[in-house]
């Protein structure tokens, strides 16, 4: 089957937003106008096309990025719906990796909200071009100018409107296009009938002023345009469009549009802007990977059908009908269903059963995928999130995705024997889908422990076990992932010697332990001179230290951010062995625990709380009572925002407490920021508890 849409006419976009900015409704309307849906589903009734997992429908939030394909004005638009809740920022990061552009949706009353900032930062890290859609213009208190100002003040973004609304709240009735200086008026409720009219006289001055500001903002990124602008020359519509497109693609400028998805206004114009200003796979920098056989050698995956096949798996899902679905983005080359591919990340050969193009909750079988496409494959057994798929002769790895370690853990127990096996299967499948979710069995207690990125994250996973896998389980109290580290340096000896008839065991090491920089992890240095410890035993010393560090020295938590320098030791020709040196290294660590001033570290969360000013005193008091450190405050519209660092152990149940402190008017987001030392009195309690005292 030949290519249906050329690369120039392909757009891979994501829709990013704060939790209640109307992202899902916006996606819905895109699907409605591109002819993919016949009836519109409202999120607040729990029946949206993109939110296809039951939990999402219950909670009215979007959790998994479903990939949907739609067509508009002769172009293919692949939409990846990204989650808007901060516990799911890994999902967002993962989908940003495969996008070429994004639409950031703002609430016209609130402007840029805390979660918008988080997602915006991530998009900037990955260099994703964006356009901004100021949604909910029909809402009470909607203020377009204020929303645009928050882009400047809170995100320092070079953003300018390419549209202006006429009216707001109930009076919102038309949109002025500042590029072409036209006006569009909506004449029916479904927003399918649009009338192009002249810009009303009383709005002309405002429109001309806004157009001049737009040209000025774009001219900063284009020398040609700047010359014309300074020389008062006429700038044509096509020149302005091209300059906006260039600046947007280079992530130097962000066009701002307006509308209300719920009331069906402005969505088609936003789709036009996606086509006009967001890049095709040919316009963005080609992705650079490296050779599996030689990590130093860079390889470029060029958007070209005739190139070697290379794709990145960005999402794994379990579908009740077809089993495991692997969503992937093709960067170069083509692939047909039934063919074999290589998973270069894991070094395995995989057979692609069927290829599916996904609509939010229905699917269409296809024969071939081309570069720039996003599709799902059935039949890939070993491929996980972040793996590279490539042609059998190719051995490119498209930079591995690195995922943060879980910061919160819970114990889960099946309610009955029948649930036991089902729970094991469920946990395996959920870990395949979500690399930030970990499950293991505690060796000492035999309990199954699950770990994730926040309370909501784990709540939803437990909920999914119940709904999708019919597993009833009891959930224990949340546990924090503490760590341990050394605060001072020391030189210690670890000696293991055992004689019990026949061959003995002998290993002797002298190691200098010093604190490492925060976040630098464990570093091992071999400084042995003259072979006092033979070379073949050095890896055993390092392995022995790593094993011992896993169980810490104070309360059984992993020891992190430590340097170990092996500088002396001795061995025995007959009795020395790898095992003996492993044990000697662990004895050295025990010795270091007495001299290196070990401390317990706890995860500190960056918490952003937004609430009406009158609750400020209560909230500040509450943050302090949770051992929090306030890092700054700022007014945001008619609300106040408090930024603070608070230990995770003090944040359990915070949602309920914030609700009661602010009569339900406060919101907060939090994510892991760094590890910090635990106060002595609390550390003593943790040690006692872990020793069962």
From Swiss-Prot:
Its main location: cytoplasm. It comes from the Bacteria. Keywords: Cytoplasm, Elongation factor, GTP-binding, Nucleotide-binding, Protein biosynthesis. One of its GO terms (biological process) is ribosome disassembly. GO terms for cellular component: cytoplasm. It is found in: Cytoplasm. One of its GO terms (molecular function) is GTP binding. The keyword GTP-binding applies. GTP binds at residues 17-24, 81-85, 135-138. Residues 8-282 form the tr-type G domain. CDD domains: EF-G (cd01886), EFG_III (cd16262), EFG_mtEFG1_IV (cd01434), EFG_mtEFG_C (cd03713), EFG_mtEFG_II (cd04088). SUPFAM superfamilies: EF-G C-terminal domain-like (SSF54980), P-loop containing nucleoside triphosphate hydrolases (SSF52540), Ribosomal protein S5 domain 2-like (SSF54211), Translation proteins (SSF50447). HAMAP family: EF_G_EF_2_B (MF_00054_B). Belongs to the TRAFAC class translation factor GTPase superfamily. Classic translation factor GTPase family. EF-G/EF-2 subfamily. Has vitronectin-binding activity. Catalyzes the GTP-dependent ribosomal translocation step during translation elongation. During this step, the ribosome changes from the pre-translocational (PRE) to the post-translocational (POST) state as the newly formed A-site-bound peptidyl-tRNA and P-site-bound deacylated tRNA move to the P and E sites, respectively. Catalyzes the coordinated movement of the two tRNA molecules, the mRNA and conformational changes in the ribosome. This is Elongation factor G. It comes from Staphylococcus aureus.
